[in-house]
Amino acid sequence: MRVMRSLRGNSGAGLISRPARLSSLRSVFTGCRAVMLPRFGGPEVFELRENVPVPNLNPNEVLVRAKAVSVNPLDCRIRAGYGRSVFQPHLPIIVGRDVSGEVAAIGTSVKSLKVGQEVFGALHPTALRGTYTDYGILSEDELTEKPSSISHVEASAIPFAALTAWRALKSNARITEGQRLLVFGGGGAVGFSAIQLAVASGCHVTASCVGQTKDRILAAGAEQAVDYTTEDIELAVKGKFDAVLDTIGGPETERIGINFLRKGGNYMTLQGEAASLTDKYGFVVGLPLATSLLMKKKIQYQYSHGIDYWWTYMRADPEGLAEIQRLVGAGKLKIPVEKTFSITDVVAAHEAKEKKQIPGKVVLEF
């Protein structure tokens, strides 16, 4: 990583310290540190820069002084070139989606948050100015108050993954009390969030996982956890399900998941092909091709199995974020953090994730 006068221990440099309500035309904040992505590649392409401009806030936006941000798989994929059709024209960009911190300033129309309040939240997957920076900018509906019962490190690990799971379960499948949910990849952040959200909704949950996460999944309320490295899930699991969330997204898990659904059920995969096809063929060809592929699968599975098929992506959802906050505050939703790094060690953090040295959640601290 190229470091341009790192400001570790002086994250306020280049800033006037007075927090304020900001109009969309001016800002009392001039610049801050940020981890910039000037080109796609391995972890070494990151540059830690100082005095990166802080844009003026729009009326509905909030300036958040970051205390912790998590490293999501999407961050690593974007760094390596995923979504280049969206991001390449805007390089250098700031990656990162999750953040937990303190409100430093608010736009003129923001009503639910105030300066000095501790908050956490997540940006949309295609946001160009991410959260790997001292001062992140999110819209009001992308943030909520951080429960006092958890730390910024713990909070930063939650929102993007939990909102992705929320969209799958509540917007796509619309799960209700008493229904059965099967999760492929229950040990990952999205899968583990889905288990906890479904249990809180009164659902019966079964999950596939690797052995070291089995106890944690059962402790979270799942009724069955199947170690796919040693067990055959098609033999170990009995009965039909109302919904399947596939966080793995391979041909085999899709086949198995579809066959486990009862008629009227919902199959949701995180591995939709809109971005990859657009990257390969461009917007003009790739986006219609992706839409056509999705519709083909929807029609195919509706005809052959009587189920609905979805590509699931995270979206801002104030109602979902409010419920996530409530469950977090009640101790019913958490994502374990395996290791923390300083923001100045972002290259090491990404290298560890890329080499699969740290299977669990990684957080960057400021």
Where are these regions (language model features)?
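N-terminal mitochondrial targeting presequence
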Residues: M1-C32
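Terminal helix/beta-alpha structural elements that buttress the NAD(P)+-binding lobe
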Residues: R2, L25-N58, R65-I106, K111-F366
